[in-house]
Amino acid sequence: LSVIGLTAGVAWDGYGRYRATTRLVQANEMADRLIAAAGIHAMERGVTSAVLGAVATAGPPFRKQLAELRRSGDHEWRAAIEIARRLAAGRPDDAAFASALARAERSYDVLAAMRLRVDEDLIRRAAAVLFGEWIETITVFIAANARLRELSFRSVELSQDFSQLNLSLRHSLWVISEHAGLERGTLAYYVGARRPLPPEKLDELKSFRGVVDHSIETLL
């Protein structure tokens, strides 16, 4: 009986490690896809900002580029969300992760509605979207998914050192990419509009660049 009990215990421990490893693989894939999606959505933010600032209507090349960015970014995002739903189903007690998942999905719905307004503006120059509205909407969406990515590693049983290293590195890379993207998006709008940067926007750009430079220094 003792041998049987020992064997059962070893088997149970092995199963537990297998489940933890599976969740780790899923969390890593989800995080990688969310990072990829964030980079593509940041490019969408910049291209859209440039066209919103332009005086003329957006031509077919711009609209084609924008459509491709949306398709690519959303493909990565949807794949990540499917993984997130599986992680959430496996951890029904993790309210924070479930809440972050719901917030990410809601923010996508808001972004989708904003894109419809953007499309109308790009074709008709109807002034349907203000630059600030667009930047805020897509930035909130990107940030919501960054939060989901961070919390994904709470839903797996890992050594604390590994989790923290993984999380910190990914977060630093995201901070660099996101603030550089905000810098590019703001510049793109004013270049497209052929308008000088207002003093407050120049201060914003300096702030974005400061965050990027500081984050790079912490990684070196």
Predicted features along the sequence, with ranges:
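Hydrophobic alpha-helical segments
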Residues: 1-220
